[in-house]
């Protein structure tokens, strides 16, 4: 396992990563930037190359502006590749990487999923109505990658299958048709995912999920898979007590490097497609906070019911604030909480500052 502390870019941390935050990273690059187009608001969208090999890998992050964990991991990877490490040298010798760290700078600036026109770029791959989508497609066609890495964040509600473990990292080899056939490009992507999953089972056993492979030809992964290019969806999820996603960032970094190693060393066929389907499919079994016996605090709640709370991420003064909101009320059998509170237990509601907001939320509830 790589010593991550040597490669982590300490200049970018937290959840709010806009274009200004990564400008210092750009200045450290050994290669010139490539402007591939501009956003709705006229912001340059920039990419850069690393390596000189025949195996071409295109990777992009922050297609959704509020999904920044993978952007941090990409810069950690860049740091790693610039060091005098045998594997890094092999990757750069065997591969040419085209790296697009922020496809949606307008969304990143205001911490939204969509671009400035309120369009989800990951539902615009076929229609190509947005300048960011058109710039990406032009880059894809000119670079002609052999592999594509589509880098995202996922919500905290996902579990790794029907278990009490969060899906800390999830992957998908997207479908290329409604029948979800295992085409040659899908098979390659599946084997690369198996390689990453095998590695990740050491640091986070049982915490890797597989995304649903329902087909949508306006999603970028499905579109690229239709074009015959092995495409992998990476989803950075929740690690316990890591809402800033710094641990998940490390796991995404390790995953990207593992995939590049597998490509660079021609080890893809060492892995079996069948093992891809052994990765549990994501389920939605988690709340950020699961409160038992809320009727003890507020009699408006029904006895025997629980309250599932999820955090809303809000940008306040260039920081992300996590504001609790009631998501579901009911027996909630079979659900889990990243934090659980038992209202009978006075220790949980002893008014520590971290829980006052949740207590007030329960007290304000009215049917």
Task: Enumerate the language-model features and the residues they cover.
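Short active-site segment of divalent metal-dependent hydrolases/proteases
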Residues: 65
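C-terminal accessory segments enriched in acidic
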Residues: 1-20, 143, 172-367
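Active-site/substrate-binding loop(s) of hydrolase catalytic cores
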Residues: 54-56, 68-206, 225
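Conserved beta-strand scaffold positions in the cores of enzyme catalytic domains, especially
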Residues: 33, 47, 99, 148, ...
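Conserved hydrophobic/aromatic pocket- or pore-lining residues that grip, position, or stack substrates
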Residues: 42, 62, 99
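N- or domain-start disorder-to-order transition segments that initiate the globular core
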Residues: 24-40
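Short, surface-exposed beta-strand/loop micro-motifs that present aromatic residues
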Residues: 44-49, 221-224
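Short beta-strand-to-loop junctions in surface cap/lid or active-site-entrance loops
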Residues: 46-54, 62
């Amino acid at each position: 396992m790589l010593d991550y502390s040597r490669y982590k870019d300490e200049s970018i941390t937290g959840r709010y990563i806009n274009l200004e935050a990564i400008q210092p990273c750009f200045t450290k690059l050994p290669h010139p930037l490539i402007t591939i187009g501009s956003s709705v608001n006229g912001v340059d969208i920039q990419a850069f190359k690393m390596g000189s090999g025949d195996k071409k890998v295109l990777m992009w992050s922050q297609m959704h502006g509020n999904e920044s964990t993978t952007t941090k991991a990409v810069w950690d990877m860049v740091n790693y590749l610039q060091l005098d490490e045998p594997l890094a040298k092999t990757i750069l010798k065997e591969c040419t990487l085209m790296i697009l760290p922020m496809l949606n700078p307008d969304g990143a600036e205001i911490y939204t999923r969509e671009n400035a026109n309120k369009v989800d770029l990951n539902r615009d791959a076929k229609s190509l109505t947005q300048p960011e989508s058109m710039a990406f497609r032009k880059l894809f066609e000119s670079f002609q990658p052999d592999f594509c890495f589509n880098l995202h964040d996922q919500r905290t509600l996902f579990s790794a299958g029907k278990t009490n473990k969060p899906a800390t990292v999830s992957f998908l080899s997207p479908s290329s048709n409604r029948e979800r056939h295992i085409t040659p490009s899908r098979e390659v992507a599946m084997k690369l995912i198996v390689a990453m999953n095998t590695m990740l089972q050491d640091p986070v056993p049982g915490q890797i999920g597989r995304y649903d492979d329902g087909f949508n030809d306006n999603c970028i992964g499905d579109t690229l898979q239709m074009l015959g290019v092995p495409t992998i969806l990476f989803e950075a999820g929740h690690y316990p007590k890591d809402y800033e996603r710094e641990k998940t960032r490390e796991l995404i970094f390790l995953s990207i490097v593992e995939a590049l190693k597998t490509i660079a060393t021609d080890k893809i066929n060492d892995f079996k497609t069948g093992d891809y389907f052994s990765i549990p499919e994501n389920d939605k079994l988690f709340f950020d906070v699961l409160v038992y016996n809320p009727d003890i605090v507020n009699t408006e709640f029904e006895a025997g019911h629980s309250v599932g709370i999820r955090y809303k991420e809000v940008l306040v003064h260039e920081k992300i604030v996590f504001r609790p909101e009631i998501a579901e009320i009911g027996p909630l059998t079979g659900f889990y909480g990243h934090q659980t509170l038992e209202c009978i237990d006075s220790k949980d509601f002893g008014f520590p500052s971290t829980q006052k907001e949740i207590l007030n939320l329960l007290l304000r509830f009215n049917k």
